């Protein structure tokens, strides 16, 4: 299952704008730039452990919500149920995009993972953790803190991985451009030699 082309293109453009290294004027002088793996082992391990932690988080959230549902005000009942549903849906998409983007070194997928983590998931979990009106139980605070640590680490490591990926793609592009330029100049030299012989 791939992202639609317009979404991939927009995420690629956003990634180049946000993560591109504008201080560089040319490609890095690395002979192994084409073969270097830039996916992050730390990010992948975090995603792996997060995929096992999330069902535990979800079950404990539902159990704690069931225990305190009767003492919550009506508006908080609606808000908490909505937030848990949103977190569940976003987390499934987020983990998929993170794994695909990191393992296959796809910048748009990893950028989507980073944006979902930073702009949606982190604020929602911080709302559940820091809102006093929700009357959090000790187990809830503990699981929300662990989830927040996972998210914070993933946001930071995804940013660093995206920066490396974008810089490597830019270096590959510049090397391909240079190769095309050198091959076209070789063709011009051959044409000149042929015309001189005539």
Swiss-Prot record:
Pfam families, per database record: Transmemb_17
One GO-annotated biological process of the protein: smoothened signaling pathway
Transmembrane segments: 47-67, 78-98, 110-130, 142-162
Membrane topology summary: Multi-pass membrane protein
Domain of life where this protein originates: Eukaryota
InterPro entries: Uncharacterised_TM-17
S-S bonds: none
Glycosylation sites (chain numbering): 13
The keyword Chaperone is assigned to this record: no
Function according to Swiss-Prot or TrEMBL: Transmembrane component of the tectonic-like complex, a complex localized at the transition zone of primary cilia and acting as a barrier that prevents diffusion of transmembrane proteins between the cilia and plasma membranes. Required for ciliogenesis and sonic hedgehog/SHH signaling.
Subunit architecture: Part of the tectonic-like complex (also named B9 complex).
Family assignment from sequence similarity: Belongs to the TMEM17 family.
The protein, known as: Transmembrane protein 17
Organism, scientific name: Mus musculus (Mouse)
